[in-house]
Design a protein with these regions (language model features):
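A generic secondary-structure signal for well-formed alpha-helical elements
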Residues: 1, 39-42, 70-75, 88-92, ...
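Histidine-centered active-site microenvironments of extracellular/periplasmic hydrolases
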Residues: 2-59, 79-80
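Polar, surface-exposed loop/tail segments
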Residues: 4-6, 51-119, 194-203
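Structural recognition of the beta-strand scaffold that forms the well-ordered cores
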Residues: 8-10, 34-36, 100-102, 123-126, ...
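Short, solvent-exposed loop/turn and secondary-structure capping segments
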Residues: 19-24, 46-47, 69, 136-137, ...
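C-terminal, low-complexity/hydrophilic appendages and adjacent surface loops
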Residues: 27, 107-190, 196-197
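Long, internal low-complexity/basic segments
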Residues: 31, 157-172, 188-388
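Short glycine/proline-rich turn/loop motifs
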Residues: 42-49, 179-185, 255-261
Length: 388
């Protein structure tokens, strides 16, 4: 009789296995099936008819409060998500729930920083580091023949513009009509007819990540050192500081000449993470920021924070501006943790993705052995790629 007394949730944790699905914020990676089995005796807890299909948007964060509501337990104040089933849930309250938040940070050794907001048929995507190409090497993905063939065809110049998007810089923001464009290849962010929708969804996403607040505007090594014990308290204590970092990150949404002065101030700030984000914004603008090269070169030479200096390297190498490459070796030698090493190696791997012919003059011995003594260590995966 256990089957008649059990509500079962059946769902996946990500989209499909083909390239550009799992590990990306496209709908092919985010949208998954959710099937709920409800026995006859518990159907009164479900706001929908058994055997029916609902278009209600359900996020992962909704599952915990839903389980509590089904069990008749009050959902704690402050818990993320909204119950979509339970005695307290009315169909009229959730049948029009059509908003979903998505994100991408690190997948194994591959870093990016992407946030998405889906509202009905429209989806807004915010690429905070748009120079991070989707094709950035990731060990397990490139074991798949489809990834390998796609990369080979790109390098041979055999892809059309749509097929090539995967290997090229993204725009800082994008807007898609999912009903008409389910594969998210037709960006509407520059369409005059969609500016009202774009600005509204941009604002909604901005307010959401500020209110959370979104901890990922600090680099992961810093979070592990300062926030891992109690990330909620850390976030609330640093809410204003995070909002200031988000404001700097958002400078790449404006024309460069209107924000150059603010970028300069960020690069000069005493807060290293403001300098960090100022450099990321420079890389987003590319050679439009060439007037800041002397300031960026000074940061590379004199900044006390390794992760700030590597962002200076990133700008210079993305724009093929010469500097002493021995600095790379110094930065790697000065890494204080495996996580910091992996983040630095992500930048170096990105450069190799853009410039496959480039060679680097360091070896695995630059790091402690325990960082790369197992084949699946993230640092080892990056080093295997860079050394091969």
């Amino acid at each position: 009789g256990l089957m008649e007394d059990t509500i079962i949730f059946y769902y996946g944790d990500h989209g499909g296995v083909l390239p550009r699905s799992k590990g990306y914020t496209y709908e092919s990676g985010l949208q998954i099936p959710l099937v709920v089995y409800v026995p006859e005796k518990w159907k009164h807890l479900i706001p929908f008819d058994r055997g029916s299909r609902s278009q209600t948007f359900v996020e992962f964060i909704d599952l915990a409060p839903t389980a509590l509501a089904l069990a008749g337990v009050n959902v704690p104040t402050g818990m993320d998500g909204t119950p979509v089933m339970g005695k307290i849930v009315q169909k009229s309250e959730i049948q029009n729930k059509n908003t979903a938040f998505g994100y991408a940070d690190r997948f194994d050794e591959k870093y990016d920083l992407v946030r998405t907001l889906r509202v009905g048929k429209y989806k807004y995507t915010r690429n905070y580091q748009p120079f991070n190409i989707d094709a950035l090497f990731n060990f397990y993905r490139y074991k798949m023949l489809a990834y390998k063939e796609w990369l080979s065809l790109y390098r041979e110049g055999k892809l059309n513009d749509v097929q090539s998007q995967f290997f090229e810089p993204k725009s800082p923001e994008a807007l898609y009509n999912i009903d008409q464009d389910p594969h998210e290849i037709n960006d509407l962010s520059n369409s005059e007819n969609h500016q009202e929708i774009l600005l509204r969804m941009r604002g909604q996403l901005h307010e959401r990540i500020k209110e959370m607040p979104d901890l990922s505007f600090y680099p992961e090594p810093y979070l592990l050192d300062n926030a891992i014990v109690n990330p909620t308290t850390f976030g609330q204590n640093n809410k204003t500081a995070i909002a200031e970092l988000i404001a700097i990150a958002d400078l790449n949404l404006a024309p460069y000449d209107l924000v150059e002065g603010k970028i300069k101030l960020a690069l000069q700030d005493k807060n290293p993470w403001k300098r960090y984000w100022g450099l990321i914004v420079c890389s987003s603008f590319g050679m439009q920021a060439k007037g800041l090269v002397p300031q960026i070169q000074k940061i590379l030479q004199t900044d006390e924070v390794n992760l700030v200096r590597i962002r200076a390297v990133e700008f210079l190498m993305l724009n093929k501006i010469s500097f002493d490459k021995n600095i790379l070796k110094i930065l790697l030698e000065n890494t204080s943790s495996e996580t910091e090493a992996n983040l630095i190696l992500n930048t170096i791997s990105l450069i190799k993705g853009y410039q496959p012919e480039i060679k680097f003059n360091f070896s695995k011995e630059i790091f402690p052995g325990e960082w790369h003594d197992e084949p699946n260590d993230l640092v080892n995966r990056r080093l295997e790629y860079l050394m091969n």
